[in-house]
C-alpha cells in the first residue's frame, strides 16, 4: 500500500525532496538513470524504425493544378530528407547506447520526452528498488511540461 495516498502536494514534494537527498537514492541514481536512458533509447529506436518501414509513395502525382503537383513533389522530397536524418540519428544513437545512454537519449529526445523518461524512472524505482517517486508533473499539476 502506498503510504503517500491522501497527502497534499506540499507533503509529496517534501517527501520527494527528502528521498532525492538520501544517500541510498544518490547511490542508486546513476544505475537507475542508465537503465532509464537505455530503455528510452530502445523504445524510440523501435518507433523510428517502424516509421522508416513505411515507404513514401513514388507513383506519379495526377492533378491538373501545377501548384498541387509541385507541393506534393516537395513534400515527398522533404519526407525523404527527414528519413535520411532519422536514419543518421538512429545509427548514432545505436553507437552511443552501450557506452553513453544519456547522450543517446539526448540525441533522440523531442518535445514531450520528459514524460516518457519520468514514467520509466518512476517504474524502475518502484519495481527494482521498491521506491515510490513522484514525477515533476505529479508534483506540479498546474505546470505544463514538454
What are these regions (language model features)?
Residues 10, 14-17, 34, 38:
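Extended, non-membrane alpha-helical segments enriched in charged/polar residues
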Residues 18-29, 97-99:
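Charged, low-complexity interaction regions
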Residues 144-146:
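Short acidic DE-rich linear segments
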